[in-house]
Amino acid sequence: MEEQSKLAERILDQVADAVICANHSGTIIRWNHASTALFGYSAEEALGQSVELIIPEHLRAAHWSGFDAAMTKGATKLQGRPTLTRALHKSGRRLYVEMSFAIVKGDTESEVLWRGR
């Protein structure tokens, strides 16, 4: 099982799309290399931070409303379909990114997975 876990980590680090996981409170717990390329933050800078790190201030209330609803229902409104949205780069520059969201159910709690480009 440990070997499969290591393989999964290597795959996530090498895919071309940004992959970000956040726990139930919105704290970033997984940040791959493509996330660094897209948003400018290293994994060390992003891990442990709120996902607000990459969400423009004017979109945060809507984000948290959708996030809380998804965590309560165990499913996202878009059901994994990609959507075009705004995000923030480390430099402060606003980006248009295509994102999709999924709830990943674990043994004890669920996490939110973002995939973006």
Model-derived regions: residue spans:
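Short loop/turn microsegments at loop-to-beta-strand junctions
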Residues: 16-17, 82-83, 100
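Sensory modules in modular signal-transduction proteins
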Residues: 2-25, 30-36, 79
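Short loop/turn elements at sensory-signaling interfaces that couple input to output
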Residues: 99-114
